Amino acid sequence: GLSSIKSDYQHRVLIGGRKTGGHGVGKINELAAEVARDDADKIVDAIRTAKHFFESDAFLLIASAAGGTGSGSIPIMTKLIKERYGDKPVYNLIVLPFQHEEDTEERTIYNSAACLKSVNSVADAIILVDNQRYVRKDFSLKNNMAKINALIAEPFYNLLCAGEEKKSKYIGVRMLDAGDIIQTLVGWTVIGYGKSDVPLIRIPFAGSRNFRKKSVEIHRGLRAMDEA
């Protein structure tokens, strides 16, 4: 994911240089919280000077719940950004640990619990990503990571592009914009996502469905979402 972020100082802000030398906090999230407080102005300045800052509708902060730097700093930064820019909601995407991390690393569960409790009190919405749920046993670790990242990013692409499409042929009957998203994302949030391939050439009257069949399919889909 970081490969697409520019490497200049405005896009990659190093925090904790004085306390940790920029080498992380060794899973000690309390230290990460201190680092975030000390260097918060560096991050806020980078946000404020961003090219499209005034066009943005909301903030999305992403962190791992099990690590030290992310889990300790994200509640601090969320609170600070909300105080500075109260007119824009701040969302948190929290990545939950793999099962083997919980079994082998002592601080994993503690950091995750502390992180979730902290962000719940400051973020406008929290979206959880369960790494373990996406794991495929027949995939290598590298392929698993790539697949998980793709599954996370795909639904977010459409969500973040809401209201941005300008070509009429891509605009559907029902249009969502940033205001609709802001009104919807509140508290603990789940994003349902689905897609269907549509043939380029459709034969008239072939496989046509009446409204009863469509209604049955909709109810099946709703039931499947409830069970999930």
Where are these regions (language model features)?
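Tubulin/FtsZ superfamily GTPase core signature
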Residues: G1-A228
